[in-house]
């Protein structure tokens, strides 16, 4: 995502940037993300020019697009979306999403959506993992080329983004919720400053 932040817009927006190798991958709240061999790591740079509450909806757009893309390779019933930005495969974490934004005033002028996917086999010995990592290849026995997955994901993101623009966020929320993990259960949500516990509805 560091490279994506320095993108000067020469090739327009939105624009995908893919890393063939990551050395400082990270997740929410500064957590490390172990990028295993054959893993997919890419960022989408956008200029939404909208309030932060609207820009944040792209987290759900990305999650829905990511699940759609993964469902091409594995049984869709094995995939669920975990609040706020992970995708689980057979109960293990296969993908994560990270949003970073900047802007002036109340508007977000630039939004970077970082996406990491274990396309190969799951990394080993991941400390303090809430959900054990799983790789797509653990189920399929084959590693999807990162270039191929980018084409699939970019097409799915464009389709879900179009749905957001044309039909509104309610439709995106409905799609996300239909595949949400732990719906109706007690969950704990943590931010940089606070921890909230309650029923996930």
Regions found by a protein language model. Give the residues of each.
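Long, positively charged amphipathic alpha-helical accessory segments at protein N-termini or as interdomain linkers
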Residues: 2, 52, 56-78, 89-201
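N-terminal lobe of the biotin/lipoate ligase/transferase fold
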Residues: 1-76, 143
């Amino acid at each position: 995502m560091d490279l994506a932040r320095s993108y000067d817009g020469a090739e327009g927006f939105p624009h995908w940037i893919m890393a063939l190798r990551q050395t400082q991958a990270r997740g929410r709240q500064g957590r490390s993300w172990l990028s295993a061999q054959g893993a997919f790591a890419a960022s989408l740079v956008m200029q939404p020019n909208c309030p932060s509450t609207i820009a944040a909806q792209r987290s759900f757009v990305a999650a829905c697009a990511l699940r759609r893309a993964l469902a091409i390779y594995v049984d869709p019933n094995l995939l669920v979306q975990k609040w706020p930005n992970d995708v689980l495969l057979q109960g293990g974490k296969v993908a994560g999403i990270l949003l970073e934004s900047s802007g002036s005033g109340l508007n977000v002028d630039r939004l970077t959506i970082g996406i990491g996917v274990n396309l190969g086999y799951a990394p080993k010995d991941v400390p303090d993992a809430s959900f054990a990592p799983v790789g797509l290849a653990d189920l399929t026995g084959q590693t999807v080329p990162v270039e191929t997955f980018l084409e699939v994901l970019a097409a799915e993101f464009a389709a879900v983004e179009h749905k957001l623009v044309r039909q509104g966020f309610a439709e995106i929320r409905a799609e996300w919720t239909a595949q949400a993990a732990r719906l109706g259960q007690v969950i704990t949500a943590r931010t940089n400053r606070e921890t909230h516990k309650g029923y996930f509805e």
